[in-house]
């Protein structure tokens, strides 16, 4: 009886740490660590889709994590349900259920890095999106309206310039149903590529579980774009192209929720440089207290421009050849995103 009560209390506590969106949620490795059963309520009451992502080499642990439904799928199975031609991820479908239970059958309920992404059938754009794993994503196709890339490990996304294809795109570290500017969860836009008849390309580094991209599918239905990923981030960014820097596990929605992974760095140390002087625009989504400021250093003057102060949008303009971004708030409830763009002067 006492053991059952303790498990129930622990499940309630752990559920509060999930990353919540209006019609979806994310579960990380620490939500399941030391937990035999994790109960999730309401998200599947009208049916739901479940995607999983795990790093290669962690299949043995993932096989011991089960989603309670009629077929009793394990996470390793779910994470490797791919379309054989595109390597797009296929979900497990759960019919209407007030509560779903996730079982951790690993010895001592240990865990390895993972993502369990549960999306209600109420979510928008379920029929116009594609989902991929970062560790095997390399697509040269007409893009879907929304593309979501998943990984519990940091990754880099690249799309080269293309003079023959045009498009526009916005990016957020959310699922596909929150990537548009009209999203219901108040999620911060990390980057956009303006509407153009030629594709300028981009390279972005991601230390979040999801990166979603929304394209102008109506205007450019035949745009043929190459998008690929490599695992890892290096913190050496190009100031002459727009981009962003975030804290590990950043989501950027009004809930303030943060995703956790043992593969994330404990700090942020990024350098953004160019060959010549530029007028630099920095826009921050800052959820960090005064004890954990986001330090922005002008590499030309060595001046420091800290950003902090709880939940606030902040901005800074500099004339410089480079910017360093440093932050040491990992492991706290703090988070941040810093979006940058510039023009030559």
Question: Which residue ranges define each predicted feature?
Answer:
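Cleavable N-terminal signal peptides of Sec/SRP-targeted secreted and luminal proteins
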Residues: 2-17
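Domain-level representation of secreted and single-pass membrane ectodomains enriched
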Residues: 15-345
């Amino acid at each position: 009886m006492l053991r059952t009560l303790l498990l129930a209390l622990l499940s309630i506590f752990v559920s509060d740490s999930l990353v919540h969106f209006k019609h979806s949620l994310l579960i990380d490795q620490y939500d399941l660590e030391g937990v035999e059963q994790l109960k999730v309520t309401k998200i599947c009451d009208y049916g739901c889709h479940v995607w999983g992502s795990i790093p290669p080499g962690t299949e043995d642990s993932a096989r011991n994590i089960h989603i309670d439904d009629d077929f009793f799928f394990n996470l390793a199975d779910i994470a490797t349900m791919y379309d054989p031609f595109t390597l797009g991820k296929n979900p497990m479908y759960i019919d209407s259920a007030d509560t779903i239970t996730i079982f951790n059958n690993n010895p001592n309920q240990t865990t390895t890095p993972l993502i369990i992404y549960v999306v209600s059938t109420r979510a928008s754009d379920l029929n116009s999106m594609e989902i991929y794993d970062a560790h095997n994503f390399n697509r040269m196709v007409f893009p879907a309206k929304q593309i979501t890339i998943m990984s519990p490990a940091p990754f880099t996304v690249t799309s080269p310039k293309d003079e023959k294809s045009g498009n526009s795109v916005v990016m957020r570290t959310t699922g596909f149903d929150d990537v548009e500017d009209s999203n219901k969860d108040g999620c911060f836009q990390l980057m956009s590529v303006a509407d153009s008849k030629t594709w300028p390309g981009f390279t972005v580094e991601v230390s979040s579980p999801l990166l979603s991209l929304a394209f102008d599918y109506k205007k450019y239905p035949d745009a043929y774009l190459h998008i690929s990923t490599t695992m890892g981030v290096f913190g050496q960014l190009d100031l002459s192209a727009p981009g962003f820097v975030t804290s590990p596990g950043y989501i950027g929605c009004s809930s303030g929720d943060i995703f956790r992974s043992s593969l994330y760095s404990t700090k942020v140390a990024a350098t953004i440089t160019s060959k010549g002087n530029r007028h630099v625009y920095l826009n921050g989504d800052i959820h960090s207290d005064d004890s954990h400021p986001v330090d922005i250093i002008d590499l030309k003057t060595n001046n420091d421009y800290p950003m902090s102060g709880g939940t606030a949008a902040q901005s800074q303009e500099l004339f410089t050849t480079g910017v360093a971004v440093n932050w040491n708030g990992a492991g706290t409830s703090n988070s941040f995103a810093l979006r940058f763009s510039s023009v030559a002067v």
